[in-house]
Amino acid sequence: MTELSPKYNPAEVEAGRYQKWLDADVFKPSGDQKAKPYSIVIPPPNVTGKLHLGHAWDTTLQDIIIRQKRMQGFDTLWLPGMDHAGIATQAKVEERLREQGISRYDLGRDKFLDKVWEWKDEYATTIKEQWGKMGLSVDYSRERFTLDEGLSKAVRKVFVDLYKKGWIYRGEFIINWDPAARTALSDIEVIHKDVEGAFYHMNYMLEDGSRALQVATTRPETMFGDVAVAVNPEDPRYKDLIGKNVILPIVNKLIPIVGDEHADPEFGTGVVKITPAHDPNDFEVGQRHNLPQVNVMNDDGTMNELAGDFAGMDRFEARQATVAKLEELGALVNIEKRVHSVGHSERSGAVVEPRLSTQWFVKMDELAKQAMDNQETDDRVDFYPPRFNDTFLQWMENVHDWVISRQLWWGHQIPAWYNAEGEIYVGEEAPEGDDWTQDEDVLDTWFSSALWPFSTMGWPDTDVEDFKRYFPTSTLVTGYDIIFFWVSRMIFQSLEFTGRQPFQNVLIHGLIRDEEGRKMSKSLGNGIDPMDVIEKYGADSLRWFLSNGSAPGQDVRFSYEKMDASWNFINKIWNISRYILMNNEGLTLEDAESNVAKVAASEAGNVTDQWILHNLNETIAKVTENFDKFEFGVAGHILYNFIWEEFANWYVELTKEVLYSDNEAEKVITRSVLLYTLDKILRLLHPIMPFVTEEIYAQYAQGSIVTVDYPVVRPAFENEAAHKGVESLKDLIRAVRNARAEVNVAPSKPITILVKTADSELEDFFNSNINYIKCFTNPEKLEISSAIAAPELAMTSIITGAEIYLPLADLLNVEEELARLDKELAKWQKELDMVGKKLGNERFVANAKPEVVQKEKDKQADYQAKYDATQERIAEMKKIKS
């Protein structure tokens, strides 16, 4: 047995430990076929850069789960991997190339992809280093990447199978277009932000010049693609105009007036311009009325030749030029400034352009129905907290067909080929012959990520051992911001292709926010690098903070004050451990367990030993129960209270009465209970703080704590009588301590303590444990009896079953206390005078902010209460003196 360092130093404790775990292969599945499997697939981080604090939280929760299950005897697999993150990674690499004055087009597809693979290798290494710093117990022998050949095979099969069922199709529809990345986006890749904008009101003159129809738009540059104006067929103002024409300003061409319910008589003028190639609602109107589709923009957001004199302009430049021209022509009615919601690309930040484009889509109605129906079966996915099941169902009910093609080079190239005759071939392998050209687009990143739980296990080969044993997975841990992005897609793809749900449980956590509750972002400059936190506090402190502040579905506020508290807690554990191990005298864990069994059987030890074992039992039960519900924050509070309050502040202090005595037999029992309880504490803590628990465990036991048994409740430790008795003992000691503090009597000063109880069992208990009471209260005189009469002047405390009297004359030097109270009274009078003067100033009351005035009134009330209380104490002291 070695000795722990005098001071807890996380850098020393954590250095080299992770590699030792890897070398010992303790993170791999046990291979025990009799053990129940428990598997988690890591939500694959994007290879776009370093991991942030949100990743640290997400992976910490997973590691807590998998470490506990491993200790509980499950055959655990935590499968790591990373996501190629198509648009995000390509954007990062293009940005790096731009700094060198190079574009991807300069390099060509193959050489550009070589650069992206270099980027991937660089950041995959960084991410794995971060995982190691966090202590994540993943099985690297099964590491996956979404562009691995095995996963690519799964992607191709899913695409082809869905295509053959008619659930993947190619067509020309309005999609979200990112002009910066020059690619299509799905609805959920669009972030809507409120921005300062305007409604531009314009007049479209009837063909006969008799009147004008007023329309409004936020995007006047799209008017070159207008092919109609619509009115509601039931709107009496315009019914007679349906079928006539208006003149499109600037372009001077005739476009028809159509009747369509899309036009709302209650909104604006009730007339809307119809631009089918640039608005999803207008596209639907165009389909109903067989209107042409006129696309007036290039893929980079500039205007094309159909915009006439505005061709080549950026869309926002064209907007201003168009408005100026309308004003010049007298067609601009007015500009109405307004804040409105505008879609932005999640990745590039560019304003998204609704645009007619030929893309590949997944038909969602049947897939969504399967997912919703499954939630009514025993094979459903359980969400924690349950309210997110409703969120999931709502999204599924309102889902649209999913645009899956992306105009990128980095990703899974769509397995579709075209020939000169216009034929399309879709297959897992390329068609024979040289006259076929593969579709240049790639699939949406989420298409491959949706297959992650089963493709990583070997699917489509369903006979491989990992797929048979570890799929469906047990639990998914992820943030609420990607329930639709990812969780829902994994569910419907898994149900479609494996017939099973991808995971049994989904633990949803919130976001990491700063101390002010703001979301961390680059723009605010409030992001926190978890590696910086680890360097200062250690991984265990960060993990404890992330776990202890965690409740399913809730956000967490990061603060350095909380990190200080985390470090202090671990330092407390370190110091307790040092005390126990320094007093251990060579006792082995096996000997301790044997002696503790005697305590449980009341064959050895004392009531405090029985009390701590009873409370340890309760702690194990409550922590395990809350872990099973993923209530890690609740479990953390239970552990904290037991370790700091019950074990350190009470039991460890109580043991000093024995350890400093000459009774060797009692010392052995006390050391045994200390070591046994410490061992169970370390095992309970290990899933949360693996490094420090391994370091301490190694001082008294062989092997690694990673694979030891997790604590279980032992019925023999249940002892309500011991629990009730020691809790009463603690209440008595606390009451005396509080009374001393109230009248500023030092703990070192002996005092008279009178305990009156009519409960004979309690009286016997207190008297039989009187040494503990004396040790903690320092009495000059201590009486415990049912016959005690209450002194006339005494501080009185009432606890369950007893009254405690501390005679005031014994507690105080009356003359000194009166002098002190006189000074205190003068102090409160001075404060009252000052605040009274301020509140008596009419100008202050009239001109100061209401909250400032109220603050002064609150001060006045507080000072008055303190003044009155001090006067009462003076009266009491004078009564004692007389």
Curated annotation (Swiss-Prot):
This is Valine--tRNA ligase. It comes from the Bacteria. The keyword Ion transport does not apply. Catalyzes the attachment of valine to tRNA(Val). As ValRS can inadvertently accommodate and process structurally similar amino acids such as threonine, to avoid such errors, it has a 'posttransfer' editing activity that hydrolyzes mischarged Thr-tRNA(Val) in a tRNA-dependent manner. InterPro entries: aa-tRNA-synth_I_CS, aa-tRNA-synth_Ia, Anticodon_Ia_Val, M/V/L/I-tRNA-synth_anticd-bd, Rossmann-like_a/b/a_fold, tRNA-bd_arm, tRNAsynth_Ia_anticodon-bd, Val-tRNA_synth_C_sf. Its EC number is 6.1.1.9. Belongs to the class-I aminoacyl-tRNA synthetase family. ValS type 1 subfamily. It comes from Streptococcus pyogenes serotype M1. ValRS has two distinct active sites: one for aminoacylation and one for editing. The misactivated threonine is translocated from the active site to the editing site. CDD domains: Anticodon_Ia_Val, ValRS_core. SUPFAM superfamilies: Anticodon-binding domain of a subclass of class I aminoacyl-tRNA synthetases (SSF47323), Nucleotidylyl transferase (SSF52374), tRNA-binding arm (SSF46589), ValRS/IleRS/LeuRS editing domain (SSF50677). The gene is valS. It is found in: Cytoplasm. One of its GO terms (biological process) is valyl-tRNA aminoacylation. It catalyses: tRNA(Val) + L-valine + ATP = L-valyl-tRNA(Val) + AMP + diphosphate. A motif ('KMSKS' region) lies at residues 519-523. ATP binds at K522. It is an enzyme of class 6 (ligase). Monomer. Residues 808-882 form a coiled coil. GO terms for cellular component: cytosol. GO terms for molecular function: aminoacyl-tRNA deacylase activity; ATP binding; valine-tRNA ligase activity. Keywords: Aminoacyl-tRNA synthetase, ATP-binding, Coiled coil, Cytoplasm, Ligase, Nucleotide-binding, Protein biosynthesis.
